[in-house]
């Protein structure tokens, strides 16, 4: 294993702590980042994270965005958030209208409701203003029905359709706890689906008969139909693996609908979605994108850590806390060996590294989904899963608005 550690040490490029501030202090520091982090060409670059609640991961992403938009003509940043709600974020970004905190609250994903994501949005706004760019956000997830139904309501040509949408929103609000867990009962789903078809079918008919294609209507119909598919008990069978693969395959389709040849875009999502190999649950969004556009066009970065804390909903305390422990890795995990090379923050290109990983070496890596899992490690080869790794030895929980 000493040879494996030596190989890691030789290939890992140590990064300055300033990289985790999200802001270079001067041009020399920016140039230093650029020399050390060589991504090369890409069409879609996905930047992952081991948890949704880590302060340093947000800051590293901000630094990467600053770096990449100077090197590549990036025009879009995709978020693991519902498509319709992210359109409101774009309105804030491009026209400075709306309440950012309320927009983030509408995502119904508490991990976005934090100081660090606000900083990321404001950084993109500054980049657009200073460099004459028009980078926009888009969502590729579809787990919320609320904004998409309100969008579809605009297209109703009669009072009956608007009433049906209002009834659906009311029903989903009452069932919200089950909606967020994809645990709608078969009877409730049949009722919701019947009402939904009264909205979907006439709007689809109108869209087909129209001479002018309405991309906004089409996108919202797709999102709502994806939401229904994911929550259909006959399709998901209450099986985590089935739901996971369905969600990742549909997220990949949503990314590809936003993508056009020659375009450069960045995706921000959990490591478990962006990695190129199957995870513990299913095939991943990254795997589907790799299959669709090829290894030279799809690239991914995994962000990892060995110790510290992360922010998440703690069921024992029944609230969101920033002191959930990142459990130090054992010798069967890749992070254990990352800690051995004495580089607190490093960038690691994984090309050529897989062959150096001995059969008796690590076969696990950390995965922290929503909440506080009892087991923080899953089986897999981290070096095969990502093109690049940025490892941050010690991390802290992000500054959630719910901590105050």
Protein language model annotation of sequence segments:
Residues 1-404:
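Structured catalytic-domain cores with a bias toward divalent-metal coordination
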């Amino acid at each position: 294993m000493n040879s494996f550690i030596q190989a890691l040490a030789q290939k890992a490029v140590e990064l300055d702590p300033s990289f985790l501030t999200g802001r270079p202090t001067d041009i020399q520091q920016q140039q230093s980042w650029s020399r050390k982090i060589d991504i090369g060409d890409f069409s879609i670059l996905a930047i992952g994270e081991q948890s949704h609640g880590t302060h340093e991961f947000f800051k590293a992403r901000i630094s990467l965005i600053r770096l990449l938009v100077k090197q590549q003509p990036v025009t879009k940043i995709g978020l693991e958030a519902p498509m319709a709600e992210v359109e409101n974020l774009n309105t804030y970004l491009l026209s400075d209208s709306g309440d950012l905190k309320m927009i983030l609250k509408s995502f119904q994903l508490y991990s976005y409701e934090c100081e660090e994501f606000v900083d990321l949005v404001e950084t993109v706004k500054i980049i657009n203003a200073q460099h004459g760019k028009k980078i926009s956000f888009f969502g590729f997830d579809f787990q919320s029905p609320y904004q998409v139904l309100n969008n579809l309501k605009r297209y109703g040509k009669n009072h009956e359709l608007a009433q049906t949408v209002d009834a659906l929103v009311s029903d989903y609000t009452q069932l919200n706890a089950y909606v967020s867990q994809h645990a709608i009962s078969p009877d409730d789903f049949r009722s919701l689906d019947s009402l939904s078809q009264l909205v979907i079918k006439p709007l689809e008919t109108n869209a087909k008969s129209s001479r002018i294609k309405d991309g906004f209507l089409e996108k919202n119909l797709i999102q709502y139909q994806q939401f229904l598919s994911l929550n259909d008990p006959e399709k998901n069978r209450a099986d985590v693996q089935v739901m996971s693969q369905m969600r990742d395959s549909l997220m990949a389709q949503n990314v590809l609908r936003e993508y056009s040849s020659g375009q450069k875009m960045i995706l921000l999502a959990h490591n478990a979605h962006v990695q190129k190999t199957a995870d513990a649950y299913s095939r991943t969004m990254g795997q589907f994108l790799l299959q669709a556009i090829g290894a030279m066009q799809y690239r991914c970065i995994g962000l990892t850590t060995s110790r510290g804390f992360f922010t998440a909903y703690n069921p024992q305390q029944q609230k969101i806390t920033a002191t959930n422990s990142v459990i130090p890795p054992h010798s069967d995990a890749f992070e254990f060996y990352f800690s051995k090379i004495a580089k607190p923050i490093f960038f690691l290109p994984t090309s050529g590294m897989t062959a150096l990983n001995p059969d008796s070496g690590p076969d696990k890596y950390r995965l922290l989904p929503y909440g506080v899992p009892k087991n923080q490690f899953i089986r897999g080869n981290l070096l095969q899963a990502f093109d690049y790794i940025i490892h941050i030895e010690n991390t802290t929980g992000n500054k959630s608005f719910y901590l105050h």
